[in-house]
């Protein structure tokens, strides 16, 4: 126990304070960029571990496992990681979609039913497509897994599972 406590204290002491919005600038050396990105990843993982509720994660995993199809709804800079997750689902034999256009997302929502599971990724909960898509999914009894900040969860209560992420990043003043 003592060894583990010392290890954890040492790791915490080695974490560097990094500006999450601007971890580096034009004057940063490659070594500084690497060091700051390491600090950023460590901070992100630690915060995610603190915020993520294991019961919600388990619920989300079970919903995905039993779903006939998983549809991912997101936009902007979240499209690439969402597409990567879709590809992993497809590789595992799970039918999945992730469309970039709002029109395709709306049509997918309209074609969904309780056999689908929707994963909605919006850290702020303010993504423009949500105003149209969430009521459709709700009316069609589609279980919705929300990936977002605590604010997003408060803004959109009543869904099947919430995977909460940090809200330290500025929505308007950052490197994207």
Residues covered by each model-derived region:
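HTH-adjacent hinge/linker in prokaryotic transcriptional regulators
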Residues: 1-55
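Short, flexible segments with low predicted structural confidence
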Residues: 17, 35-36, 60-61, 108-109
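Amphipathic, non-membrane alpha-helical segments in soluble helical-bundle scaffolds
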Residues: 31-35, 127, 176
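Short helix-to-loop capping/linker segments positioned immediately adjacent to catalytic or ligand/cofactor-binding
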Residues: 48-52, 60, 72-73
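Glycine-rich phosphate/diphosphate-binding loops that line cofactor/substrate pockets in enzymes
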Residues: 55-68
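Glycine-rich phosphate-binding loops that contact phosphosugars or nucleotide phosphates
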Residues: 65-175
């Amino acid at each position: 126990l003592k060894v583990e406590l010392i290890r954890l204290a040492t790791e915490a002491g080695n974490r560097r304070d990094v500006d999450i919005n601007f971890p580096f600038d034009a004057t940063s050396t490659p070594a500084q960029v690497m060091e700051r990105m390491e600090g950023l990843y460590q901070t992100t993982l630690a915060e995610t571990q603190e915020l993520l509720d294991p019961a919600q994660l388990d619920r989300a995993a079970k919903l995905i496992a039993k779903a006939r199809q998983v549809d991912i709804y997101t936009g902007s800079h979240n499209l690439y990681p969402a597409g990567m997750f879709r590809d992993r689902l497809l590789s595992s034999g799970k039918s999945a979609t992730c469309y970039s256009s709002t029109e395709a997302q709306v049509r997918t929502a309209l074609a969904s039913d309780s056999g689908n599971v929707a994963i909605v990724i919006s850290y702020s909960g303010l993504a423009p497509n949500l105003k149209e898509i969430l009521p459709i999914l709700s009316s069609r009894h589609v279980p919705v897994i929300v990936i977002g900040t605590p604010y997003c969860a408060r803004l959109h209560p009543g869904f099947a599972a919430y995977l909460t992420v940090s809200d330290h990043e500025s929505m308007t003043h950052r490197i994207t």
